[in-house]
């Protein structure tokens, strides 16, 4: 049965197989017919994905597929008969494929060095790849190998002509990027062998830019040279890299500070981004806009490094201030100019304070030549202009008395080297001696200050304008004698000064400054006109009010004034040497020769000031003369009262004024004289002891006050120290908290680094898969 079934089954199986083959052939014929036929409008096939030749070559080299890379180079080579290969300016297509880069400027040779693939490096170098090709940051393949520490690749590149002096955009050589000692030793040995100057290599780019800029300046033309890819100018490069001298030359040649590159960056954007402070200052000084915007709408401060943020804010403020100054100067330029003559005119002396008047008088004395006549105050270059516009530019004493200027140009003027002759040998003239009748009538109605004969040079208007101002000065008894005392006493030799010292003069005596004579007036005439030097009084105060005020002041002084121990001793010395009342007065006690204390009003009231000089022969006048003589002879006879008179403790008693102290000294002299005549001195001893006890208690109080202040300071310091100690635990707790926070941050960063390593591995895997996919697609597309 098997033999019968075998022949029957064999033909059936063969027929089935033949039918299957026939169907397969039919399918192939139909598929070929459809593939060869043109597709219809609705049956168009999808376009095949095709990458650029450079991207395919980079992918093949990154994947290590050297056969595929070799086929691409062979396909790109046009052959010996093509015209492109014969042109030396145009690189061959195979060379263009070899040196092709991605968006970051990384070539296949860069990528092979990064991947440490020495086989691909050798293949590319043998095929003619550029060994010193730089990426967008200026890194060559040797920079990459040195940074990664690949000794074999570095040796191979150096053996095939790699430039060891190449500088990247940060100004670093491959030696500066070496990570290992072996790599550093290799590069140093190669530098020594080639004799490369490292510093000169780093300055090569700057020197080249400087040379080109000078050539442009000498040629008179500044070309608009731009980078073909970024559009950056020479000023952009110099600003970004800090080539200050190149920037100065470019700006001197008129280079625009608002030039834009491809991204809309100005040179100031580049300098701020790279943190070049000197470049930022230089560009800001030449009008670089702080508000210039890029194509992305960013200002220089938005792109700036953190180190130059404060500098940019300062430069922006300076630009704003300079702009405001220019606008203000332009506005002032349109206004009318002030006459230059008014800039040197001196203001009126009546508007100055007493201290300023004295300073002005000192300056005028220094300018005045010795022994020459003429006015002591006034600039010779101003002439009549100053006299016409400022008639009151006349040095005045503190109480308003005019300085000695004679109206007669022929009268002699004594030099400043002989002050004693002015004080003792000259007589005073009346203030109305040189005035006309009309002017004399006008000045009689004014209760202000009467001026000397020199005032005839002044105008009536300025006189009436100045005297009410001086009359408004309130002469209070509490007014201290200012610094003109020291100036007045310094101008007189001590050996010739027989006048009453300021602290020892009677309040009733009026000290008058000497005035140069215009005529030989007799002594009696000067006495009659003595009231012309009186202090100005207030117009609104009546005579009865002045008398009542003076009486109240005298009563208050007698009841409230205290006397120091020094004053008491001084009074005892003076009282011990009081001469007999029948002794005649000295000739120097003539009231007309007695100098007046400036700025001090007679506290006895106007009744004594207005007493006629004819009554000076009465008992009261004789007694006043004897008192003045006693006080004058005190310092002259060798008493040691000078230091006590000038000591600050004795200048004022219990806050009193100089005038009050003079009254106290006069009363003290009288009382001590009476006590000296009395045989019983018990009251004086008791008063002295009480006074000493009072002084001792006062000193103890002062020491206690100082001690209390010191204790307060020490208490404050202790409190602050305790507060610092109390705050220390809180500071330690804060430091511990910050330390824990930093530790947590470090742990998080470590975790992120681990995750970054995983991501890097995944990225590499995806890149490999992408390269394989590109190769598959390229093969299928063929």
Curated annotation (Swiss-Prot):
Q: Does the keyword Metal-binding apply?
A: no
Residue spans making up a coiled coil are 301-332, 681-782
User: Ranges of Low complexity compositional bias?
Assistant: 1-19, 77-88, 401-413
Q: Which InterPro entries match?
A: Ankyrin_rpt, Ankyrin_rpt-contain_sf, MYPT1/MYPT2/Mbs85, PP1_Regulatory_Subunit, PRKG1_interact
Q: Where are the ANK repeats?
A: 104-133, 137-166, 230-259, 263-292
Instruction: Enumerate composition-biased segments (Basic and acidic residues).
Output: 353-369, 537-546, 664-685
Job of this protein: Regulates myosin phosphatase activity.
* Identification of the protein by name: Protein phosphatase 1 regulatory subunit 12C
Q: What is the lineage of its organism?
A: Eukaryota, Metazoa, Chordata, Craniata, Vertebrata
